[in-house]
Structure formats: C-alpha cells, structure tokens
Amino acid sequence: MSSATLKDVQFIPNAKSGMVSGLLLMPASAKALLVLAHGAGAGMRHKFMQECAAKLAEGGIATLRYQFPYMEKRIKRPDSESMLTDTVRAAVAVAKKNAGGLPLFAGGKSMGGRMTSLAAAKEPLDGVRGLIYFGFPLHAMGKPGAERGDHLAEIKLPMLFLQGSRDGLADLKLLKPLCKKLGKAVELFVIAGGDHSFHMLKSAKRSDDQALSDAVKKTVAWIKKNSGL
C-alpha cells in the first residue's frame, strides 16, 4: 500500500443525481484499472471494499471505487435502476480519463456488480474489456430463480463470477449452468465455504481474509489474462 496513491474524485452521473464521490487507488506498477461499485447496504468505504481495493493494489490492479447517489446522500433506499446504471456509466468514463491507457475492467460487490452488468447489457461500457462480480445476486434470499441473470446473454465481454458456496443470493445449482450457457469467456470461481461476502464459518480452516485474498488472487490473474499481459 505504501507504493499506491489514493486520489479523491467527484463526478455528476446525470442531471438529477447531484455530485457523487469516488476513490482512485493507483499502485505505482499498475497493470490495469477496475471500476468497483459497492453493494446495496454499504458504500465505497466499507471494510470489504477497502480491503478488496488494497489487495488488488498489491497485485498491481488500480481501482476506482465510487458512491451511488443514494449512498452519497445517506439515504437507505437505493436509487432507480436507471440512476444506478447511469452512475456506472459515468464512473467508467471517469476511470477511463484517469487510467492513463491502462486496460479497463468494471464490476462490483453484489448490487454494484449487477448494475454494472445491466449497464453493459443495455449499451457497451466504453473501453471496458471485461466484467467482474464479487457475489452476483442472482435471486432474493430464499427465493431461488435465475431471471435476474437473463440480461447477461446480451453482454459480449469476458465475465468473472466470484461466488461463495454458501451464498444465499446465488444458488450454485442455478449459477453454474447459467455461466456454462454464457460461453467459454465466462468463468465461475467458487470460494468454498464462503457466504455472499465470502465470510467463513468459525469451523472453517481458513479465515475471511484468506477467502478474500483467494478471490482477489483469482481476479488479478483473470484481469492479466484478459489484458493480454
């Protein structure tokens, strides 16, 4: 982390959003930049987001974390889908301006990843080479179904799903065949024993930190592969 610089950024997603903030973490030897959206209940400074960005920086991957408008305004209820996807698109544009020519990727935690996928399905995200989901929310808790993944077939990019085997928001019996159907450019990496945020049971042989490290290690390798590095 000592060799990485942290820069505050601000941008306006659309005419109704107001200003939102972001954090650009750029390691000295950055190989690529990942636009990283937060989940529904916690913003870009949440422990998961901070630790994920820090571990990615150690692997040579820069990140742009950012707030959705409702989180910036400290409102509990998420914005409309259109506002969220507009914010994703605007964040990607900001990242591209700050990337210095680095390969660009996008994704996020839970809802942030899904909104990134919806934005990409509607219209390609400028300059983005692949999408990464840290716990894709395929369905509501206790209500298994794959309808929330229908739009993924419209995305013509490599995708990486990082999913805990105990994730209550993504039954692997549904997610595995979905990923297979999407084609060879789509990869599913399962964190054995992890939940939706990769938390491990106390009886597990590895810690939450180790589980996140495994997910990040996979992410770094996948980004490098899809950057031609």
Q: Where are the language model's segments positioned?
A:
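Serine-hydrolase catalytic machinery in alpha/beta-hydrolase-like enzymes
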Residues: Q10-L104, F198-D208, G228
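A conserved short beta-strand
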Residues: D126-L138
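Short beta-strand/loop motif that positions the catalytic acidic residue
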Residues: I155-K156, F161-Q163, D167
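Catalytic histidine neighborhood in serine/cysteine hydrolases
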Residues: K181-M200
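Catalytic active-site module of serine/aspartate enzymes centered on a nucleophile-bearing elbow/loop
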Residues: S203-L229
